[in-house]
């Protein structure tokens, strides 16, 4: 239910809700990939961390290119995680 009375405003409300749900799903998926890298680093598994990082990098870059997150946030995630992976023996 929306408060909109004008037809175009009602349509925009429906579209906004649909995109909000889609974006929430995409953000959740991105966070899951990031957590996988952190988990591998915490376990000390360098090979697993590197493999998870490659997958995470694809997802984060795609989210940044679509405007879901800022490009700088994507860069911060990647640089922080690659530094932690390099610290592993």
Curated annotation (Swiss-Prot):
It comes from the Bacteria. The keyword Plastid does not apply. Residues 1-28 are annotated as: Disordered. GO terms for cellular component: cytosol; small ribosomal subunit. GO terms for biological process: translation. Keywords: Ribonucleoprotein, Ribosomal protein, RNA-binding, rRNA-binding. The keyword GTP-binding does not apply. GO terms for molecular function: small ribosomal subunit rRNA binding; structural constituent of ribosome. Binds directly to 16S ribosomal RNA. Belongs to the bacterial ribosomal protein bS20 family. HAMAP family: Ribosomal_bS20. This is Small ribosomal subunit protein bS20. The gene is rpsT.
């Amino acid at each position: 239910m929306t408060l909109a009375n004008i037809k175009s405003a009602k349509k925009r409300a429906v579209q906004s809700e649909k995109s909000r749900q889609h974006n929430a799903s995409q953000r959740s998926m991105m966070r899951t990939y990031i957590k996988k890298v952190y988990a591998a680093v915490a376990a000390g598994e360098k090979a697993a961390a590197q493999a998870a990082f490659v997958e995470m990098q694809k997802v984060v870059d795609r989210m940044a290119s679509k405007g879901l997150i800022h490009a700088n946030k994507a860069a911060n995630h990647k640089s922080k995680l690659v530094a932690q992976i390099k610290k592993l023996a």
